[in-house]
Protein backbone atom coordinates (compact mmCIF):
# COMPACT_ATOMS: atom_id res chain seq x y z
CA UNK A 1 0.00 0.00 0.00
CA UNK A 2 1.15 3.51 -0.78
CA UNK A 3 2.42 5.56 2.18
CA UNK A 4 0.15 7.98 3.98
CA UNK A 5 2.00 11.17 4.90
CA UNK A 6 1.45 13.75 7.63
CA UNK A 7 2.96 17.16 8.36
CA UNK A 8 2.22 20.43 10.09
CA UNK A 9 0.78 22.82 7.49
CA UNK A 10 1.06 25.97 9.61
CA UNK A 11 4.41 27.57 10.55
CA UNK A 12 6.39 26.13 13.43
CA UNK A 13 5.83 28.11 16.62
CA UNK A 14 2.98 29.70 18.54
CA UNK A 15 -0.18 30.79 16.72
CA UNK A 16 -3.94 31.06 17.02
CA UNK A 17 -4.58 27.98 14.88
CA UNK A 18 -2.41 24.96 14.10
CA UNK A 19 -3.13 22.59 11.21
CA UNK A 20 -1.96 19.04 10.59
CA UNK A 21 -2.45 17.65 7.08
CA UNK A 22 -2.71 13.94 6.28
CA UNK A 23 -2.73 12.62 2.70
CA UNK A 24 -2.98 9.03 1.49
CA UNK A 25 -5.11 5.88 1.69
CA UNK A 26 -5.11 5.85 5.51
CA UNK A 27 -6.51 9.37 5.96
CA UNK A 28 -9.96 8.03 6.86
CA UNK A 29 -8.33 5.52 9.24
CA UNK A 30 -6.71 8.44 11.09
CA UNK A 31 -10.14 10.04 11.39
CA UNK A 32 -11.60 6.88 12.92
CA UNK A 33 -8.75 6.48 15.43
CA UNK A 34 -8.21 10.11 16.43
CA UNK A 35 -11.78 11.42 16.05
CA UNK A 36 -13.70 8.23 16.74
CA UNK A 37 -15.74 8.34 13.51
CA UNK A 38 -15.54 8.31 9.74
CA UNK A 39 -16.04 11.70 8.17
CA UNK A 40 -18.23 12.73 5.27
CA UNK A 41 -16.31 14.56 2.53
CA UNK A 42 -16.29 18.37 2.52
CA UNK A 43 -18.20 18.70 5.78
CA UNK A 44 -16.64 20.56 8.71
CA UNK A 45 -16.81 18.68 12.03
CA UNK A 46 -16.05 20.16 15.45
CA UNK A 47 -14.68 17.23 17.45
CA UNK A 48 -12.23 16.26 20.20
CA UNK A 49 -8.84 14.88 19.07
CA UNK A 50 -8.14 11.79 21.19
CA UNK A 51 -5.10 9.79 22.28
CA UNK A 52 -4.98 5.99 22.09
CA UNK A 53 -6.49 5.64 25.58
CA UNK A 54 -9.32 8.05 24.80
CA UNK A 55 -7.77 11.04 26.53
CA UNK A 56 -8.66 14.30 24.80
CA UNK A 57 -5.51 15.96 23.42
CA UNK A 58 -7.22 18.95 21.82
CA UNK A 59 -10.44 19.86 20.06
CA UNK A 60 -11.04 21.62 16.80
CA UNK A 61 -12.29 21.33 13.24
CA UNK A 62 -11.73 18.26 11.06
CA UNK A 63 -12.16 18.29 7.28
CA UNK A 64 -12.03 15.28 4.96
CA UNK A 65 -11.57 15.42 1.17
CA UNK A 66 -12.18 12.26 -0.82
CA UNK A 67 -9.84 11.40 -3.70
CA UNK A 68 -9.54 12.65 -6.37
CA UNK A 69 -11.26 15.84 -5.19
CA UNK A 70 -8.43 17.15 -3.04
CA UNK A 71 -5.25 19.17 -3.43
CA UNK A 72 -3.06 16.07 -3.70
CA UNK A 73 -5.58 13.95 -5.59
CA UNK A 74 -5.56 11.49 -2.66
CA UNK A 75 -7.76 11.16 0.43
CA UNK A 76 -6.86 14.17 2.60
CA UNK A 77 -7.66 14.89 6.25
CA UNK A 78 -6.99 18.24 7.91
CA UNK A 79 -7.08 18.69 11.67
CA UNK A 80 -7.36 22.33 12.69
CA UNK A 81 -6.69 22.79 16.38
CA UNK A 82 -5.08 25.29 18.70
CA UNK A 83 -1.76 26.72 17.58
CA UNK A 84 0.49 25.84 20.51
CA UNK A 85 3.54 23.94 19.26
CA UNK A 86 3.47 21.47 22.16
CA UNK A 87 -0.16 20.56 21.39
CA UNK A 88 0.62 20.06 17.71
CA UNK A 89 3.68 17.93 18.49
CA UNK A 90 1.63 15.69 20.80
CA UNK A 91 -1.09 15.28 18.17
CA UNK A 92 1.50 14.56 15.47
CA UNK A 93 3.12 11.92 17.67
CA UNK A 94 -0.33 10.36 18.20
CA UNK A 95 -0.98 10.13 14.45
CA UNK A 96 2.44 8.55 13.84
CA UNK A 97 1.51 5.64 16.15
CA UNK A 98 -0.85 4.45 13.39
CA UNK A 99 0.93 1.90 11.20
CA UNK A 100 1.64 3.00 7.62
CA UNK A 101 1.89 6.72 8.35
CA UNK A 102 5.12 8.71 8.15
CA UNK A 103 6.29 12.33 8.22
CA UNK A 104 6.13 13.98 4.80
CA UNK A 105 9.26 15.09 3.01
CA UNK A 106 9.65 18.78 2.14
CA UNK A 107 7.23 19.58 -0.68
CA UNK A 108 5.78 16.07 -0.80
CA UNK A 109 2.13 17.21 -0.75
CA UNK A 110 2.76 19.39 -3.81
CA UNK A 111 4.77 16.59 -5.40
CA UNK A 112 1.81 14.22 -5.00
CA UNK A 113 -0.47 16.85 -6.55
CA UNK A 114 1.90 17.02 -9.53
CA UNK A 115 2.19 13.24 -9.86
CA UNK A 116 -1.60 12.90 -9.69
CA UNK A 117 -2.09 15.54 -12.43
CA UNK A 118 -3.74 18.06 -10.12
CA UNK A 119 -1.25 20.70 -11.25
CA UNK A 120 1.79 20.85 -13.51
CA UNK A 121 5.37 21.59 -12.50
CA UNK A 122 5.24 25.33 -13.20
CA UNK A 123 2.08 25.59 -11.08
CA UNK A 124 3.70 23.59 -8.27
CA UNK A 125 6.69 25.95 -8.26
CA UNK A 126 4.27 28.89 -8.13
CA UNK A 127 3.07 27.68 -4.71
CA UNK A 128 6.54 28.26 -3.25
CA UNK A 129 6.85 31.56 -5.12
CA UNK A 130 3.50 32.75 -3.74
CA UNK A 131 4.64 31.97 -0.20
CA UNK A 132 8.00 33.72 -0.72
CA UNK A 133 6.60 36.78 -2.55
CA UNK A 134 8.06 40.06 -1.25
CA UNK A 135 5.64 42.45 -2.95
CA UNK A 136 1.97 42.64 -3.86
CA UNK A 137 2.79 42.37 -7.55
CA UNK A 138 5.02 39.33 -7.02
CA UNK A 139 2.20 37.69 -5.07
CA UNK A 140 -0.37 38.45 -7.78
CA UNK A 141 1.98 37.21 -10.49
CA UNK A 142 2.71 34.01 -8.56
CA UNK A 143 -1.02 33.46 -8.20
CA UNK A 144 -1.44 33.85 -11.96
CA UNK A 145 1.24 31.21 -12.47
CA UNK A 146 -0.53 28.95 -9.96
CA UNK A 147 -3.78 29.43 -11.87
CA UNK A 148 -2.04 28.27 -15.04
CA UNK A 149 -1.36 31.46 -17.03
CA UNK A 150 2.31 30.60 -17.68
CA UNK A 151 1.50 26.93 -18.29
CA UNK A 152 -1.21 27.86 -20.81
CA UNK A 153 1.29 29.90 -22.82
CA UNK A 154 3.75 27.00 -22.80
CA UNK A 155 1.03 24.54 -23.80
CA UNK A 156 0.03 26.78 -26.71
CA UNK A 157 3.64 26.76 -27.88
CA UNK A 158 3.82 22.98 -27.56
CA UNK A 159 0.63 22.66 -29.61
CA UNK A 160 2.17 24.85 -32.32
CA UNK A 161 5.30 22.70 -32.38
CA UNK A 162 3.24 19.49 -32.55
CA UNK A 163 1.31 20.97 -35.47
CA UNK A 164 4.60 21.70 -37.24
CA UNK A 165 5.98 18.24 -36.50
CA UNK A 166 2.85 16.66 -37.97
CA UNK A 167 3.28 18.39 -41.31
CA UNK A 168 7.06 17.99 -41.46
CA UNK A 169 6.92 14.29 -40.70
CA UNK A 170 4.09 13.87 -43.21
CA UNK A 171 6.34 15.43 -45.85
CA UNK A 172 9.10 12.98 -44.89
CA UNK A 173 6.86 9.90 -44.77
CA UNK A 174 4.90 10.67 -47.95
CA UNK A 175 7.40 12.25 -50.35
CA UNK A 176 5.40 11.25 -53.46
CA UNK A 177 2.29 13.24 -52.54
CA UNK A 178 1.33 16.14 -54.79
CA UNK A 179 1.71 18.75 -52.02
CA UNK A 180 5.29 19.44 -50.93
CA UNK A 181 4.76 20.68 -47.39
CA UNK A 182 8.39 21.79 -47.07
CA UNK A 183 8.36 23.94 -50.21
CA UNK A 184 4.88 25.45 -50.32
CA UNK A 185 5.62 28.09 -47.67
CA UNK A 186 3.00 27.02 -45.13
CA UNK A 187 5.48 25.37 -42.78
CA UNK A 188 7.84 28.34 -42.95
CA UNK A 189 4.97 30.72 -42.20
CA UNK A 190 3.84 28.68 -39.22
CA UNK A 191 7.44 28.31 -38.05
CA UNK A 192 7.91 32.08 -38.15
CA UNK A 193 4.68 32.55 -36.17
CA UNK A 194 5.93 30.08 -33.56
CA UNK A 195 9.28 31.88 -33.29
CA UNK A 196 7.47 35.20 -32.71
CA UNK A 197 5.18 33.58 -30.15
CA UNK A 198 8.14 32.04 -28.32
CA UNK A 199 10.06 35.33 -28.28
CA UNK A 200 7.03 37.02 -26.69
CA UNK A 201 6.89 34.40 -23.94
CA UNK A 202 10.66 34.68 -23.40
CA UNK A 203 10.31 38.43 -22.87
CA UNK A 204 7.48 37.96 -20.37
CA UNK A 205 9.37 35.17 -18.60
CA UNK A 206 12.50 37.29 -18.24
CA UNK A 207 10.38 40.04 -16.66
CA UNK A 208 8.80 37.43 -14.39
CA UNK A 209 12.21 36.10 -13.32
CA UNK A 210 13.37 39.63 -12.46
CA UNK A 211 10.21 40.18 -10.42
CA UNK A 212 10.85 36.93 -8.53
CA UNK A 213 14.63 36.98 -8.08
CA UNK A 214 15.46 40.66 -8.27
CA UNK A 215 17.04 42.86 -10.92
CA UNK A 216 20.82 43.16 -11.04
CA UNK A 217 21.59 46.85 -11.48
CA UNK A 218 25.23 47.83 -12.11
CA UNK A 219 26.38 51.41 -11.57
CA UNK A 220 29.14 52.22 -14.06
CA UNK A 221 31.04 55.35 -14.98
CA UNK A 222 34.31 57.21 -14.69
CA UNK A 223 36.07 57.73 -11.35
CA UNK A 224 34.53 60.37 -9.09
CA UNK A 225 31.26 60.50 -11.05
CA UNK A 226 29.30 59.77 -7.86
CA UNK A 227 28.68 56.03 -8.25
CA UNK A 228 29.24 55.21 -4.59
CA UNK A 229 27.12 58.17 -3.51
CA UNK A 230 24.27 56.84 -5.64
CA UNK A 231 24.66 53.38 -4.10
CA UNK A 232 24.38 54.96 -0.64
CA UNK A 233 21.36 57.05 -1.69
CA UNK A 234 19.51 53.99 -3.01
CA UNK A 235 20.50 51.84 -0.03
CA UNK A 236 19.54 54.51 2.49
CA UNK A 237 22.80 54.03 4.40
CA UNK A 238 26.56 54.55 4.08
CA UNK A 239 27.29 51.27 2.33
CA UNK A 240 30.26 52.61 0.36
CA UNK A 241 33.15 54.90 1.29
CA UNK A 242 32.83 58.25 -0.47
CA UNK A 243 35.76 60.69 -0.92
CA UNK A 244 36.83 63.32 -3.44
CA UNK A 245 39.75 61.10 -4.45
CA UNK A 246 39.18 59.51 -7.85
CA UNK A 247 39.45 55.73 -7.76
CA UNK A 248 38.38 55.28 -4.13
CA UNK A 249 36.25 52.27 -5.09
CA UNK A 250 38.55 49.55 -6.41
CA UNK A 251 36.41 46.47 -5.95
CA UNK A 252 32.79 45.50 -6.46
CA UNK A 253 30.33 46.55 -3.73
CA UNK A 254 26.92 44.87 -3.52
CA UNK A 255 23.79 46.05 -1.76
CA UNK A 256 20.41 44.27 -1.73
CA UNK A 257 17.46 46.64 -1.46
CA UNK A 258 13.69 46.68 -1.98
CA UNK A 259 11.70 49.44 -3.68
CA UNK A 260 8.03 49.02 -2.76
CA UNK A 261 8.76 45.34 -2.19
CA UNK A 262 10.55 44.92 -5.54
CA UNK A 263 13.97 43.28 -5.00
CA UNK A 264 17.06 44.88 -6.53
CA UNK A 265 20.72 43.93 -6.35
CA UNK A 266 22.65 47.20 -6.69
CA UNK A 267 26.33 46.86 -7.61
CA UNK A 268 28.87 49.68 -7.37
CA UNK A 269 31.97 49.23 -9.53
CA UNK A 270 35.42 50.72 -9.94
CA UNK A 271 35.65 53.78 -12.17
CA UNK A 272 36.26 53.02 -15.84
CA UNK A 273 39.48 54.56 -17.17
CA UNK A 274 42.95 53.65 -18.43
CA UNK A 275 44.73 52.55 -15.26
CA UNK A 276 48.43 51.95 -14.61
CA UNK A 277 47.91 50.67 -11.07
CA UNK A 278 47.69 46.86 -11.08
CA UNK A 279 45.07 46.73 -8.31
CA UNK A 280 42.89 49.27 -10.09
CA UNK A 281 43.19 47.28 -13.34
CA UNK A 282 41.81 44.22 -11.57
CA UNK A 283 38.95 46.32 -10.18
CA UNK A 284 38.10 47.64 -13.65
CA UNK A 285 38.09 44.12 -15.12
CA UNK A 286 35.74 43.01 -12.34
CA UNK A 287 33.56 46.01 -13.15
CA UNK A 288 33.26 44.84 -16.75
CA UNK A 289 32.48 41.29 -15.62
CA UNK A 290 29.55 42.66 -13.60
CA UNK A 291 28.40 45.01 -16.37
CA UNK A 292 28.22 42.18 -18.91
CA UNK A 293 26.02 40.12 -16.56
CA UNK A 294 23.71 43.00 -15.56
CA UNK A 295 19.97 43.22 -16.05
CA UNK A 296 20.25 47.02 -16.15
CA UNK A 297 23.17 49.47 -16.27
CA UNK A 298 23.17 52.95 -14.74
CA UNK A 299 25.78 54.99 -16.63
CA UNK A 300 26.91 57.77 -14.27
CA UNK A 301 28.01 61.04 -15.84
CA UNK A 302 29.27 64.13 -14.02
CA UNK A 303 26.95 66.90 -15.23
CA UNK A 304 29.61 69.51 -14.44
CA UNK A 305 32.00 68.03 -17.02
CA UNK A 306 29.99 67.43 -20.23
CA UNK A 307 26.68 68.28 -21.85
CA UNK A 308 23.80 65.81 -22.00
CA UNK A 309 24.02 65.62 -25.79
CA UNK A 310 27.73 64.70 -25.71
CA UNK A 311 27.39 61.45 -23.77
CA UNK A 312 26.85 59.25 -26.83
CA UNK A 313 30.09 60.47 -28.41
CA UNK A 314 32.05 60.40 -25.15
CA UNK A 315 30.85 56.89 -24.31
CA UNK A 316 30.75 55.38 -27.82
CA UNK A 317 33.34 52.70 -27.00
CA UNK A 318 31.52 51.75 -23.79
CA UNK A 319 28.15 51.48 -25.55
CA UNK A 320 29.68 49.45 -28.39
CA UNK A 321 31.23 46.97 -25.96
CA UNK A 322 28.03 46.58 -23.94
CA UNK A 323 25.69 43.70 -24.94
CA UNK A 324 22.75 45.24 -26.82
CA UNK A 325 20.25 43.26 -24.74
CA UNK A 326 21.17 45.20 -21.57
CA UNK A 327 19.16 48.41 -21.08
CA UNK A 328 21.15 51.51 -20.13
CA UNK A 329 19.87 54.48 -18.15
CA UNK A 330 22.06 57.58 -18.28
CA UNK A 331 22.38 59.37 -14.93
CA UNK A 332 23.49 63.01 -15.03
CA UNK A 333 24.72 63.41 -11.47
CA UNK A 334 25.70 66.49 -9.43
CA UNK A 335 22.88 68.73 -10.69
CA UNK A 336 23.24 70.60 -7.39
CA UNK A 337 26.60 71.83 -8.73
CA UNK A 338 25.79 72.21 -12.44
CA UNK A 339 22.52 74.07 -11.84
CA UNK A 340 20.45 71.69 -13.95
CA UNK A 341 16.92 70.88 -12.81
CA UNK A 342 16.04 67.36 -11.77
CA UNK A 343 14.08 65.46 -14.36
CA UNK A 344 13.64 62.49 -16.67
CA UNK A 345 13.68 62.56 -20.46
CA UNK A 346 14.24 60.32 -23.48
CA UNK A 347 17.37 61.24 -25.45
CA UNK A 348 18.73 59.41 -28.51
CA UNK A 349 17.01 56.18 -27.53
CA UNK A 350 18.12 56.29 -23.88
CA UNK A 351 16.36 57.31 -20.69
CA UNK A 352 18.26 60.18 -19.06
CA UNK A 353 17.70 61.16 -15.43
CA UNK A 354 19.09 64.32 -13.84
CA UNK A 355 19.72 64.01 -10.10
CA UNK A 356 22.08 64.65 -7.23
CA UNK A 357 23.19 61.56 -5.35
CA UNK A 358 24.66 63.82 -2.67
CA UNK A 359 21.49 65.83 -1.90
CA UNK A 360 19.15 63.02 -3.09
CA UNK A 361 17.27 65.41 -5.40
CA UNK A 362 15.86 63.33 -8.26
CA UNK A 363 16.68 59.97 -6.64
CA UNK A 364 12.96 59.20 -6.31
CA UNK A 365 12.66 59.57 -10.10
CA UNK A 366 15.31 56.88 -10.46
CA UNK A 367 13.52 54.62 -7.99
CA UNK A 368 10.27 54.90 -9.96
CA UNK A 369 12.14 54.26 -13.21
CA UNK A 370 13.77 51.11 -11.80
CA UNK A 371 10.39 49.86 -10.56
CA UNK A 372 8.90 50.23 -14.03
CA UNK A 373 11.95 48.52 -15.54
CA UNK A 374 11.19 45.52 -13.32
CA UNK A 375 7.61 45.38 -14.55
CA UNK A 376 5.99 47.11 -11.58
CA UNK A 377 2.38 48.06 -12.23
CA UNK A 378 0.22 50.12 -9.89
CA UNK A 379 -2.88 48.27 -11.10
CA UNK A 380 -3.80 44.82 -9.82
CA UNK A 381 -2.94 43.28 -13.20
CA UNK A 382 0.45 41.67 -13.70
CA UNK A 383 2.25 38.93 -15.57
CA UNK A 384 3.42 35.56 -14.35
CA UNK A 385 6.52 34.67 -12.34
CA UNK A 386 9.29 32.59 -13.89
CA UNK A 387 12.44 30.88 -12.65
CA UNK A 388 15.93 30.65 -14.10
CA UNK A 389 15.30 27.07 -15.21
CA UNK A 390 12.29 28.31 -17.18
CA UNK A 391 14.44 30.92 -18.92
CA UNK A 392 17.05 28.27 -19.75
CA UNK A 393 14.41 25.95 -21.20
CA UNK A 394 12.92 28.77 -23.29
CA UNK A 395 16.40 29.75 -24.50
CA UNK A 396 17.11 26.15 -25.50
CA UNK A 397 13.79 25.96 -27.35
CA UNK A 398 14.56 29.22 -29.18
CA UNK A 399 17.99 27.97 -30.27
CA UNK A 400 16.52 24.75 -31.70
CA UNK A 401 13.74 26.69 -33.46
CA UNK A 402 16.29 28.96 -35.12
CA UNK A 403 18.34 25.94 -36.20
CA UNK A 404 15.19 24.35 -37.54
CA UNK A 405 14.43 27.51 -39.51
CA UNK A 406 17.88 27.30 -41.12
CA UNK A 407 17.40 23.62 -41.97
CA UNK A 408 14.11 24.49 -43.67
CA UNK A 409 14.95 27.70 -45.51
CA UNK A 410 18.53 26.96 -46.55
CA UNK A 411 18.66 23.19 -46.99
CA UNK A 412 15.04 21.92 -47.14
CA UNK A 413 16.30 19.21 -44.76
CA UNK A 414 13.06 17.74 -43.44
CA UNK A 415 14.66 15.09 -41.23
CA UNK A 416 16.91 17.62 -39.50
CA UNK A 417 14.03 20.07 -39.10
CA UNK A 418 11.94 17.31 -37.52
CA UNK A 419 14.73 16.57 -35.03
CA UNK A 420 15.09 20.24 -34.08
CA UNK A 421 11.32 20.46 -33.52
CA UNK A 422 11.47 17.39 -31.30
CA UNK A 423 14.15 19.09 -29.19
CA UNK A 424 12.00 22.23 -28.99
CA UNK A 425 9.06 20.21 -27.70
CA UNK A 426 11.25 18.47 -25.10
CA UNK A 427 12.66 21.78 -23.84
CA UNK A 428 9.21 23.36 -23.49
CA UNK A 429 7.76 20.25 -21.86
CA UNK A 430 10.44 20.43 -19.14
CA UNK A 431 8.80 23.63 -17.89
CA UNK A 432 5.43 22.01 -17.18
CA UNK A 433 6.91 18.65 -16.20
CA UNK A 434 5.63 16.61 -19.14
CA UNK A 435 9.26 15.73 -19.88
CA UNK A 436 11.37 16.02 -16.72
CA UNK A 437 14.10 14.02 -14.98
CA UNK A 438 13.54 12.62 -11.49
CA UNK A 439 16.61 14.53 -10.23
CA UNK A 440 15.06 17.84 -11.30
CA UNK A 441 11.79 16.99 -9.57
CA UNK A 442 13.68 16.16 -6.38
CA UNK A 443 15.56 19.46 -6.44
CA UNK A 444 12.39 21.49 -7.04
CA UNK A 445 10.16 19.94 -4.39
CA UNK A 446 12.90 19.68 -1.74
CA UNK A 447 12.96 23.50 -1.59
CA UNK A 448 9.32 23.62 -0.46
CA UNK A 449 7.96 23.87 3.08
CA UNK A 450 7.39 20.52 4.82
CA UNK A 451 3.60 20.93 4.91
CA UNK A 452 3.27 21.93 1.24
UniProtKB/Swiss-Prot annotation:
GO cellular component: a single term: cytosol
Binding site for K(+): 224, 243, 245, 248
Chief subcellular location: cytoplasm
Pfam short name (any one): MMR_HSR1
Coiled-coil intervals: none
MF (Gene Ontology): GTP binding; GTPase activity; metal ion binding
CDD domains given in the database record: trmE (cd04164), TrmE_N (cd14858)
Annotated cofactor note: Binds 1 potassium ion per subunit.
Residues the entry annotates as binding Mg(2+): 228, 249
InterPro entries in UniProt: G_TrmE (IPR031168), GTP-bd (IPR006073), GTP-bd_TrmE_N (IPR018948), GTPase_MnmE (IPR004520), MnmE_dom2 (IPR027368), MnmE_helical (IPR025867), P-loop_NTPase (IPR027417), Small_GTP-bd (IPR005225)
Domain TrmE-type G: 214-375
EC number: 3.6.-.-
Enzyme class: hydrolase
Binding site for (6S)-5-formyl-5,6,7,8-tetrahydrofolate: 21, 78, 118, 452
Subcellular location: Cytoplasm
Co-factor(s): K(+)
Keywords: Cytoplasm, GTP-binding, Hydrolase, Magnesium, Metal-binding, Nucleotide-binding, Potassium, tRNA processing
NCBIfam families, per database record: mnmE_trmE_thdF, PRK05291.1-3, small_GTP
Subunit structure and binding partners: Homodimer. Heterotetramer of two MnmE and two MnmG subunits.
Protein family according to the UniProt entry: Belongs to the TRAFAC class TrmE-Era-EngA-EngB-Septin-like GTPase superfamily. TrmE GTPase family.
Name this protein carries in UniProt: tRNA modification GTPase MnmE
This protein's encoding gene: mnmE
Amino acid sequence: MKDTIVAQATPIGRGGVGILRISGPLAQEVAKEVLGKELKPRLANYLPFKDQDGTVLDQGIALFFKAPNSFTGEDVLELQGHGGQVILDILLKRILTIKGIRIARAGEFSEQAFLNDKLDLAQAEAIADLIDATSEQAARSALKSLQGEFSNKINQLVDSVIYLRTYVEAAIDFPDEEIDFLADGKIEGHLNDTIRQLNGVRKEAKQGAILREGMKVVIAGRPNAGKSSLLNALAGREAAIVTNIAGTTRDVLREHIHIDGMPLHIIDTAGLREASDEVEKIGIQRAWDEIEQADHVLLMIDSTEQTAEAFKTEWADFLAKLPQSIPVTVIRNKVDLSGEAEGLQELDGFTLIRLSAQTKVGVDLLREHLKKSMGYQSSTEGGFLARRRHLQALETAAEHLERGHIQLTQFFAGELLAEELRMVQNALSEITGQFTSDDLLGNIFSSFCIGK
